[in-house]
Amino acid sequence: MNRLYPKSPTKFLRITRPLLVSLLLINPGIELFAEELTNSTELEGKASKVISDTKTSAKKAKSSTDKNTEAATTLKTMEVSETKDKKLAAATAEVALTPGGVTLLNINELRDRNVSNMADVLRYAPGVYSTSQSGNDEVFVSSRGSNLDANNYAASGVKYLQDGLPITAADGNNHNRMIDPLSANYATVARGGNALKYGASTMGGAIDFTSPTALNSPMTRLTLNGGSFGQFLGRGTVSKVFNESLDGLLTIEGKEWDGYRAHNKQDRIGIYGNFGWQISSSVVNRTFLSYIKNNQQLPGQLTRAQFNANPYQASAQALGGNYQLNTETERVANKTTWTIDDKSSFDVGFSFENQHLYHPIVDTVLVPNANFQQGGMNDAFSMLVDSTQQDWGTAARYNRHFDSHDLLVGLNVGTNSDRGGNYVNKGGLKGAMSNAITKKADNIEIFAQDHWHLTDKWTLTPAIQGVFSHREVNNARLAIPQDGQPLVAPFVAPPQYNVRNFYSQGGNASNDYTGFNPSLGLMYNLTKNASLYTNATRLYAPPTNYNIADNITSGSSTTNLKAMEGTSVEMGTRGKQSINALNSVNWDLALYYSWLNNEILSVTPASGSPIASNFNNTVHAGVEGLIGGNFALDSKGTHTIRPMLSYTVNSFNFDNDRTYGNNALPAAPDYFLKGEAMYHHSAGYFMGPTFDVVGKRWGDYANTYKIDSYGLLGMR
């Protein structure tokens, strides 16, 4: 029996919304404070000290002589605060030691913004172009020119991690990966070869999200956010430190959105939790659990004429095919940290994720069929993907400080299995199966890095990484009836239609890939808080299984796709300079140039599906910058202006390609600037303008279609 899958979680949201509020507001002994924010209202139990002070006051009322209880309560508050400061300080120190482009995003500071998807979190990360094409969680992310192909739904080129454990699949794809942007305390964005500490060697690098725990969170927090086009985001968090050994945190969140275009609704629910166990004074274990159910309607693409006529409409194909991207994901992870002594530590963890995808994405296309018995216009193809993907990951890290060295040795092991198939799309309902598809991937990354402090001013950072990968795709084409009639032969469209359709393609392909990638960085400390750096790094990225599936020819047993290889050089500076006690500036500037061989790009022929191929020579180069400051308007710092500007200049081109010459790669703009200039009052009030300026970008490899530049001006 066909049905739309999965069912909408809207009813769940409407039922749980009042329960969520009640859970957080009905909490005897804890005082809640209201705080007005732009586009949101946050009711938050004032971190640890306020909670502790409330408890202490209650105990005083009960017994004014119980001094020991009061002292114990105060001491606990200091421990929680110290834990929080140490985690952020360690992350900041690691960024400061990296001789390349790395940005630390404090997500707690984003809670006074309208953050609804990944693009909002990455807004001020230089070098990373991120945008939601329709305003929902389907976000396009390109870091240093990664993911610039017709097959960008796989979202490859950037490795996502959560608490150091993989979110990205073992083959490198991020298809349907959704990380709730507010489920983390901070995120580390390491671009290009600077992500080697995570085992990544791709062009885009890695982004690691670090989760909050009960040790660095308020006991209760409620956030409500509303906006135009039916936007509602709600999340509630409760946490508790049970004793010196056990703690736990639980978050329930939901998102509803009608969308600014037709057929653009989204319903999402998420449940996240983590539980810590201090096994001994030197061993800590933490378990992470998450569940996400995310239903999204996809409005499809518009031509320029259609957009100019009505930018709010959905495409006819999206409506006819009832395009959707519906996922249900369960994930469990566990991580143990052993502090061996004051100079060494060992981390080991594992993760498992199960994801079900229901994805009507291609409406019925009609073309003449030369082999069809009755002739005339008949189905060329349509597609609905229904599959289940499972990912297993293991990560281990050993850190050792000795003499003037900070050594890191690491291992990542990942396995991916994706089983399901493509079906005839009957207006969003599942028809007959056209292709039974199984994908498998294994990936091993071994890496080592040393920060060698030559002097107080100079630090040398040699590193090396090894990649061992296996890819395998089995695509069994099934005979299906067309318009109630059996096929007398495999589908053949007349040559002028150039249709490489989903029904006719079958075959199996597998291959193994091995690469060794050295890196060498050098840093010079100008002052305690400012430095210059440079590095040279080898880049390496095997194809994803989506690339291989788009490269299979019928009956083949291997793929001719090679791994992308390249060399990147980089130089830059970052730092913070205090002008006086109330005024300061901070900056982060990087320039890089990368020569790539065998970059994997998927080119879409007219009326066909993407074909993945290697391109011999491409160049990725750019300038990345982030500058900000804090400037007092009076002698006490009551009134301050805090400007911030992120800017990126891109140059991504073919290099004497036999087909495309020196054309620019599509999708990424020539430049983009994102900034704000906020006024802050010491009482917590703020307001100011925000702006975006995005340059032109090409829509195809032949550079025949250009997407105009644009600017946005806002206020918060």
Task: List each model region and its residues.
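Short acidic/polar hinge/loop motifs at secondary-structure boundaries
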Residues: 130, 158, 164-191
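Gram-negative outer-membrane beta-barrel transporters
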Residues: 456, 460, 468, 584-597, ...
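Extracytoplasmic beta-strand/coil segments of soluble accessory domains associated
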Residues: 87, 91-94, 99, 119-165
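Face-selective signature of the C-terminal outer-membrane beta-barrel domain
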Residues: 278-290, 325-494, 587-591, 627-630, ...
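Structural signature of Gram-negative outer-membrane beta-barrels, strongest in the C-terminal barrel
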Residues: 280, 401-414, 437-594, 678
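N-terminal periplasmic "start-of-domain" segments of outer-membrane beta-barrel proteins
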Residues: 59, 66-67, 76-113, 139-142, ...
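Transmembrane beta-barrel wall of Gram-negative outer-membrane proteins
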Residues: 219-221, 226-256, 261-299, 323-345, ...
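Membrane-embedded beta-barrel scaffold of Gram-negative outer-membrane proteins
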Residues: 345-363, 525, 531-537, 562-630, ...
